[in-house]
């Protein structure tokens, strides 16, 4: 029996070592098959969500699980059409993580532990023990305790020598809304004391609240693709489900995706969206023109703009500008009824920017763009208009306007991609100035901080990407301002964090921005709500001798490889509200240590 155990331990050690080397060399990301029905993943800490609350912070770890079954069968559909022809359909089951029996999982951890024991010289032929990343095994809750994870991690000395092994056992019960079934904090402390013979213990609390889910605000910017949660951490837990004290350390987690119809900056998003259509068309040669809501054609709108400029030259009073200004105010008011818009319409639009505003809402074809620019260039050549433009504008049209001041204009061939590029350029110029006006106007950034994002010295496609980053930053700040009513003292560091991230990383709307915040600032959003996650850690010992017992409640299933029977929930029972109940999954993580010497 011992020989068989030793052989199994060596086999597992060799397999895990081989897998780790392949991952380090980036030869494969797995999963790696071990035996017929077992596979292993190598993941970075934080990339396996079900383990986020249980891991100790290792950079890399193994996850061992049962190989999932994939079914792909041809199924005869008995239904026949009018001609009597049978149809065949193919069904493929999406693989889900699979657990192994708890007893077998313990055997794998035994093998893993044996190979790390420096006293087992017969397993390593006298060679130094090779330290492997921690091993976690998915369990099927088949034991009486309901074990869903088993983990093992080597304990190393300051000289990087293995001195023992740390084990973690994660148990989980099915969902319940009956708080009377929860253990008391005293009983958890007593169990920890008896398990670890500890006389001195400290407690640390953690709670996470969903700030979008716990309140309903009419016409707010709440959107399912976006989320704002807050994490609280505090010492000295007093009871189970304790409300985080105001002295807690709190951190906002903000993930925002653009395109929410209720966002105060939705009109800006639509403008950016058209800019992206042009950029894609310039790159591929194919443009997917959006539908226009204008009753007048693009050429008619541009002609009206030119006539307005001519009338100004002739000293006539313009009615067009008044109507446009009224429409701008009306549009701004329509964006948001109950939340004051964070961004205001600029009043210093130059000719190129006004041209962009009309063309982006009305052009529906390549020929529209050509015809509009033909009108403008002809009016400039004939000296019919003398429009003003902002200093520093870098678009081709701005350069033509500057040349028209001196009566000498270069000829422009409105063929190929030239008209598309000209339109994209004036759109980029306009939107850059919009974002500058917003961030500097709200005293959230200086021009020097924004210079990277508005630079015209890079390729035009890169300019578009940087403008996308500016818009995402604006969406993040607006959500916190409009929905959470955060003031400048919080919006300023949030903006700086966004600027720093996007100077170093590509555009990514899945990124979660974090902002430390005083609990009192957001207390009205969570104090009458239920936490998504609530956790208490009971800790004793120090350094490598530290042991911890964790007891946690989550509103979502804590593991993805075990199914739980969901209890019948009354119709009026929801997950938020002052006097409403919530269904929780209780989970406990126990720790133990074994010394090798």
From Swiss-Prot:
GO terms for biological process: cell division; mitotic spindle assembly checkpoint signaling; protein localization to kinetochore. Disulfide bonds: none annotated. InterPro entries: Zwilch. It is found in: Chromosome, Centromere, Kinetochore. It comes from the Eukaryota. Its main location: nucleus. The keyword Chloroplast does not apply. GO terms for cellular component: RZZ complex. Keywords: Cell cycle, Cell division, Centromere, Chromosome, Kinetochore, Mitosis. Gene3D superfamilies: 1.10.287.1880, 1.20.58.730, 2.20.25.230, 6.10.140.520, 6.20.270.10. Essential component of the mitotic checkpoint, which prevents cells from prematurely exiting mitosis. Required for the assembly of the dynein-dynactin and mad1-mad2 complexes onto kinetochores. Belongs to the ZWILCH family. Component of the RZZ complex composed of kntc1/rod, zw10 and zwilch. This is Protein zwilch homolog. The gene is zwilch.
